[in-house]
A protein has these predicted regions:
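Phosphodiester-processing cores and adjacent nucleic acid-binding clamps
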Residues: 1-206
Length: 206
């Protein structure tokens, strides 16, 4: 009996973690080029998740829904990659190269971790805007930050992805802190329920 294989086409696959020129020091892609590139690769949708802000969201949505170019009709998915702190009001951090280190943290752990949030409906968009605003007005210190208490208050309508190697979950896994990684997953699942997902990212290693 031959084994059946699951085939994933480009039409089934959507990139949910992308940075544009609105990600300071971390984005080279121009928003105006996103729809064309997505269309050329056979995608029907694409997400924008810039670091610490949603400044490019409207421009991104307009580019994906260009009325003058039906060929580039890509479904825009809007989110952001937030900086997550244990306490958004905490100070006493310092720069160490490209890392942000918190006083008293063992083995020089970074104080701010990454977390991807994506709006799945209008309420999610409202909460995305609220979290972005509060990260700058209440949580800004080196980076615009949010914390778990804000997430718990403004989680409705949002999808949460664990993010990159700089996330709470993946950084703990990378350093062998498996119980801490499991604990973090449990916390996010408590907040987002079925809308929390572990992110899979291509890293070029077989």
């Amino acid at each position: 009996m031959s084994k059946s294989k699951t085939s994933i086409t480009n039409a089934d696959f959507v990139h949910l973690h992308n940075h544009s020129e609105y990600s300071a020091f971390d984005g080279l892609n121009k928003l105006s080029q996103f729809p064309k590139a997505a269309k050329e690769m056979g995608f029907k949708a694409l997400a924008l998740t810039d670091h610490g802000n949603i400044g490019g969201a409207i421009k991104f949505m307009q580019a994906c829904r260009d009325k003058d170019n039906k060929d580039f009709d890509i479904k825009p998915i809007v989110g952001a990659e937030f900086y997550l702190s244990k306490d958004r009001n905490m100070r006493g951090q310092r720069k160490d190269g490209d890392k942000i280190v918190v006083k008293g943290q063992p083995d020089g752990r970074k104080g701010n971790r990454h977390l991807v949030l994506i709006a799945k409906n209008w309420k999610g968009w409202q909460n995305l805007c609220t979290l972005s605003q509060l990260s700058w007005t209440e949580g800004y210190y080196i980076d615009p930050r949010i914390d778990l208490s804000l997430l718990a208050q403004h989680s409705e309508g949002l999808i949460c992805n664990s993010a990159c190697l700089s996330s709470v979950v993946n950084a703990n896994l990378l350093h062998g802190r498996f119980e801490e990684a499991k604990k973090a997953v449990g916390i996010f699942k408590d907040i987002f329920k079925e809308d929390f997902h572990l992110e899979v990212m291509y890293h070029g290693i077989d």
